Amino acid sequence: TVLSYVNALKKIFVVEESPAWNPNLRSKTAIRTSDTRYFIDPSIAVASLGIGPKDLINDLNTFGLLFETLCIRDLRVYAESIKGKVYHYRDANDLECDAVIHLRDGSYGLIEIKLGGDSLINEGADTLKKLESRIDITKMKNPSFLLVLTATGKYAYRREDGVYVVPI
């Protein structure tokens, strides 16, 4: 079965699951609680597909998915060093957040991962602000930060709306 293959891949550290984040929200929208699977090393996916840099440049959707996997891997390493965990969020209305870093003290940050470019960065920031507006701050803290993680740019900066844009 597919599940036995997934379990085998987890045992040999090819894939890893990212659990769903379940915050207190003001809306009654159902939150999807299934795990998301990522390659531990996105180069495994590239090698198994038999593709190279030119192929990825010509297929930005695949490139974006692999970039997201790379970023999730790095975010997990950073989060583990401060005893945090990385989650993902998606609700029934398809509002999603690529990564939520959550610390034991209840603080957390919301992260959207985008290849770059103003329109994608704006889209990521809008998504983060929308999710932030739905969090019930009477039951949990405000997010410590909102961040769009990108593949482009020389410097990190803070936008006027408070969202950080950080190149990996």
Where are these regions (language model features)?
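Mg2+/Mn2+-dependent nuclease catalytic core
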Residues: G116-I137
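Residues at the starts of beta-strands that form the adenosine-phosphate
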Residues: S107, S144-F145
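Accessory nucleic acid-recognition modules appended to NTPase machines
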Residues: T1-S107
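Short helix-terminating capping/connector loops at secondary-structure junctions
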Residues: I82, T138-P143
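Domain-level recognition of nuclease-like catalytic cores that cleave nucleotide substrates
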Residues: A151-I168
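Short beta-strand/turn micro-motifs composed of small residues
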Residues: R90, V148-T150
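Active-site ExK catalytic segment of metal-dependent nucleases
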Residues: H102, S107-S119
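Switch/connector loops and helix/strand junctions flanking conserved nucleotide-binding motifs
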Residues: A47, L120-N122, Y155-E160
